[in-house]
Amino acid sequence: MNVQIEESWKTHLEPEFEKDYFRTLTEFVRSEYSQYQIFPPGKLIFNAFNLCPFDKVKVVIIGQDPYHGPGQAHGLCFSVNDGVAFPPSLVNIFKEIKEDIGTPAPSTGNLTRWAEQGVLLLNATLTVRAHQAGSHQRRGWEEFTDAAIRVLAEERENLVFILWGSYAQKKGAFIDRNKHLVLSSAHPSPLSAYNGFFGNKHFSKTNEYLKAHGKTEINW
């Protein structure tokens, strides 16, 4: 199956594209886009991969579901398009960055600049029906994104995996902690941010680890 995804990822994920679950998923997604308003726009489904080739990945942040409001989702977890109001979780992410490393909140919630520095901003589910949170869960995306995380964890070394909330922590449970840095805390959602997200210092810890392993730090 010819999937429109960045070449290095295509090479590493090729086996997935031939599996029955992925064929079923593709049929489902095509059908959904033809009948409903689906986010993100079709050409941005694999945006996280396209902006961050396999060998350039330094950090992986695992999200759950794309934003389901108009103009928000563009294929990167927690990120929104330029000119779109910051969702509450993103507000809290920027608050923690300011508290942790002193960088003030930017004027845009578009995290493309992180992706271009090697941060894979990966949602577990890559599509969603407008205004229906979780509507594309358990259709096969989770299996596909598990495969992406697994191939990174197995074939790369000294990556940083950032797992916010129990969902991301379960998804990253198999990652070898001797080979990679795994940072876990509560989710930045207003419902849980004060239960361990604020003060987690994940941004400075990530950069300390990257620096210790001879990698360029992320300009958060």
Swiss-Prot record:
It is found in: Cytoplasm. SUPFAM superfamilies: Uracil-DNA glycosylase-like. One of its GO terms (cellular component) is cytoplasm. It catalyses: Hydrolyzes single-stranded DNA or mismatched double-stranded DNA and polynucleotides, releasing free uracil. The active site is at residue 65. Keywords: Cytoplasm, DNA damage, DNA repair, Hydrolase. It is an enzyme of class 3 (hydrolase). Its main location: cytoplasm. Its EC number is 3.2.2.27. GO terms for molecular function: uracil DNA N-glycosylase activity. One of its GO terms (biological process) is base-excision repair, AP site formation via deaminated base removal. PANTHER family: URACIL-DNA GLYCOSYLASE (PTHR11264:SF0). Excises uracil residues from the DNA which can arise as a result of misincorporation of dUMP residues by DNA polymerase or due to deamination of cytosine. HAMAP family: UDG (MF_00148). Belongs to the uracil-DNA glycosylase (UDG) superfamily. UNG family. This is Uracil-DNA glycosylase 2.
